[in-house]
């Protein structure tokens, strides 16, 4: 949601944009200033006779006197608003303005009317008329009336009278807020007037009064245009208070402004719907069009925007007080219990609200207090963050909302967030072997990790040429888009012909700037030309072009993501490269946790003002060791681009087992249960290069694949933390543990076949988002396929290998798997194309306008994970892909094809077992579409890390990334 520019409304409420109410009087009366003065004095003389007849304290006369005074006053104020300086004295006041203060006209008339109103009926109507007259005078005056003391005195008298208890009415409230808004605009245009509206205390020891401010505060949480006008006007005063210590102290010490805002947020939150009507299976976050249709939520968001604007422009005293009140008066007592409701629907709603709030806030101080609440506040002995992490492993809907929340948190590029989620568990380097710690900073300059990730694409998901096979592999391998440059690795690097995460749901613009976008964007390999229609098999050249565009687009997007993360993390306090901060032998996590909670004076000031370029040293250290520096053990995979790959498969494990045994004996000597695992690892690694022969595949990729599978499928290590994301109470502190966040992500990732398609989109996007970070500890943990971890620590490569095996086993058990896979791709492409054609707004708006924090181009999840609100035409067109063909063969996932034992989608009236089996098959087929694209995305990210621009690792002349990055400690 875009931040509202509060100050830009100043001009729209200026006098020049208001339609004059007395337009029909301007031409005749302003022709002769002397005549205007004569008419003005005539009206005033008649008013004076009524005032003097009654006396200053006598009871006013009847309704005729009141009506006469009201009519004469209206005529005088109309003339006064049109008064101009005479040509002989252009800088002086006009004749009417010079006469009115001399007679104290406004104060005398107003005092008489107020006295009459106290004794009669209809006080609110007459008060509303007075407010309307003064608003007209202020808004339409052609001279600076507020610079004259008698005019300000009359206004203050009227504002003071508005504080007396009178029956409220919509007209009275509207007139008061409109007058106050006009006064705020005038004061913003002439800041020196603010001190004149600050009245001295009526008695010694009392607080001063700023009626211009105090009369607006009660309306900040009102609905409709009335509350919006108040929220538009108050930031103008807040901006002026930043340069006025007197006004700043008055607002902070002698007004209820900050408590009203905080308690108002609490009251408005209590009126929000506790359950959200989910529009479709893909729903995972609240977008602007969603909450605009909910009046209670729209009012809350308007008030939250107002708090954000106040903190942005107010005096530092007001900023600090308001932030404290929001934390202690809204987040802790309201948001904390709301996030811990027992009902799943309420948990989904509160999590979605929190994600929306974090995405909408732009002021670092307010964002910091929200993060402090998440990271440090404890509810029932658990931090809010731990509770939210545990919910990733819950049901599909709550999992999706939680993943969306963590995606928003990672988009902030805040050091404390990533420290609490991942880095504090990786800093001690307990997850790697002792001999592997120097390799943490290594950079994969030769793309071996990319080769390894691409080699994990299941055979059933690769494109196979029809029988007899056509000699097209060599030409494909020589294509410029191939991830490998060696022709010997043609079969090692599979043909990633499935639609990419970006291409499945189409891009905002074509790949090259020279191409003009058509009415509906086209994904690679799915252009609008008849040659690429679904009914025609692509030629080898078209398939090669699809591959090149597919993987090249991943590389472009990965480069943008890595560069953005490098920029955003520059002001972090440490590079997290295994040396800084230095790991300590204390119990796991104690040092890093204390680091985040240190007072500001005891911690490196990396927030406003100082910019430490420590984050750049992580990548520089790895790259500086030279291209020949490779980690000795190559246990997790062998680069497929080596021509002598088979020999390396046999040689590397022998060296790696020695390193593995040495590291285990040094680091895990006191634990039992690892001896059997090491023996099995040694046997598996020593047999990694032999493999079994297969007539369908050349020996090299099969040997590599079996060597990998023998390593990635060891017996389950002791300890329950792989099955349960959270560390159990009896788990030893010294046992390697990568944290509950990574544990629950890996556990969810390993069950990709059971997840819904939308959960997998969000899950893989979150892992890719983590992989883009430049910190060597995190980069090596996720992307270094040669890193040797402790036996009890699962690597991402092991998890992906497990998913690959499950997909291949499922494909072997499903007779019509190739047809189902093709239909799933067609459905996803058709849906993305139609949704994109109906509306280009694919995801939430950027949180702020800074170019460094612009959201990525529409990805698979961002374009598919939209509400199911497509028009009927789009829905019917998408279903064409899913309907059975005329010949009885199913074209999509809505019905089974001939020979299929199980339809993908459940049929009406089917047994629960049949429906459950259909859902299982559907999720597995969609997983087979997503998994290869995820592997290509990881491969592209690993290559992007190796080619990160050197200037990004140095001090930038343009400044750092988002303001919240390295913003300092989150504790008060």
From Swiss-Prot:
Bias (Low complexity): 479-490, 523-535
Keywords: Phosphoprotein, Protein transport, Transport
Domain of life: Eukaryota
Pfam families, alphabetized: DUF5917 (PF19314), KELAA (PF19311), RAI16-like (PF10257)
Region Disordered, residue ranges: 465-496, 510-547, 573-642, 710-733
Alphabetized InterPro entries for the sequence: FHIP (IPR019384), FHIP_C (IPR045669), FHIP_KELAA_motif (IPR045668)
Residue list for modification Phosphoserine: 467, 510, 523, 529, 533, 859, 897
Compositional bias per record (Gly residues), positions renumbered to this chain: 618-627
Signal peptide: none
Similarity section: Belongs to the FHIP family.
General function of this protein: Component of the FTS/Hook/FHIP complex (FHF complex). The FHF complex may function to promote vesicle trafficking and/or fusion via the homotypic vesicular protein sorting complex (the HOPS complex). FHF complex promotes the distribution of AP-4 complex to the perinuclear area of the cell.
PANTHER family: FHF COMPLEX SUBUNIT HOOK-INTERACTING PROTEIN 1B, RAI16 PROTEIN-RELATED
Protein name: FHF complex subunit HOOK-interacting protein 1B
Annotated source species: Pongo abelii (Sumatran orangutan)
